[in-house]
């Protein structure tokens, strides 16, 4: 996919036509413009979600939805940049929305609350992935990994902590090393799901 390789800026009707070996104008028989093409692309990748039916365990299903969504965004880096807009309304997207709502049916809460929980998880995933993608872009641009950057700034950080002006920051840094992205994702996801569970009647947690 052009957007996967080169980003959305490289996605033009002419470029798509070249990839397909077709005339540019012939594409307009199928899609009206680039925005409509992107909506079709969003719906296509929504079909990569592996959650096919609700298991009855809301926590397990929401965690799976979050991990799947992160995976889709990382495989298609362009997707996170358009995910804040209007939701896609294609069949794959609507099916995933339906499954997500069904997965939360065992929460025993009203539809509005289900929507809020779903949005909280979804927006967390988007924000987390945007951070991951930004790190990758910096690494490609500078040739410096996040580990190498941390090592390079460590003397400065230690110098600042030694002043005693940042006791809370010092305790946080001294408590252990930074989590890698996978571990950080799971930690925050479980924190969110714990917060949701804490709002439920005991029998539904």
Regions found by a protein language model. Name each.
Residues 109, 134-205:
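C-terminal peripheral helix-coil segments that are non-catalytic and often amphipathic
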Residues 2-36, 40:
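Helix-turn-helix
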Residues 99-148, 152:
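A contiguous pocket-lining binding segment that forms or flanks enzyme active sites
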Residues 46, 50, 70-74, 105, ...:
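Short amphipathic alpha-helical interface segments enriched in basic and hydrophobic/aromatic residues
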Residues 50-95, 111-112, 118-121:
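Hydrophobic alpha-helical connector segments
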Residues 36, 64, 95, 99, ...:
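Amphipathic alpha-helical interaction segments
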């Amino acid at each position: 996919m052009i957007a996967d390789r080169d980003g959305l800026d490289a996605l033009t009707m002419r470029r798509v036509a070249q990839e397909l070996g077709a005339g540019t104008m012939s594409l307009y028989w199928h899609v009206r413009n680039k925005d409509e093409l992107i909506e079709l692309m969003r719906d296509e990748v929504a079909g990569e979600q592996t959650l096919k039916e609700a298991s009855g365990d809301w926590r397990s299903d929401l965690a799976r939805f979050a991990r799947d969504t992160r995976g889709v965004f990382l495989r298609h880096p362009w997707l996170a940049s358009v995910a804040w807009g209007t939701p896609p309304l294609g069949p794959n997207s609507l099916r995933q929305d339906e499954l997500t709502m069904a997965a939360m049916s065992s929460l025993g809460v009203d539809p509005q609350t289900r929507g809020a929980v779903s949005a909280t998880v979804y927006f967390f995933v988007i924000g987390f992935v945007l951070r991951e993608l930004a790190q990758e872009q910096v690494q490609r641009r500078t040739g410096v990994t996040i580990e190498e950057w941390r090592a390079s700034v460590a003397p400065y950080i230690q110098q600042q902590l030694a002043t005693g002006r940042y006791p809370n920051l010092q305790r946080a840094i001294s408590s252990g090393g930074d989590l890698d992205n996978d571990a950080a994702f799971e930690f925050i996801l479980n924190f969110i799901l714990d917060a949701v569970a804490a709002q439920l009647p005991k029998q539904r947690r």
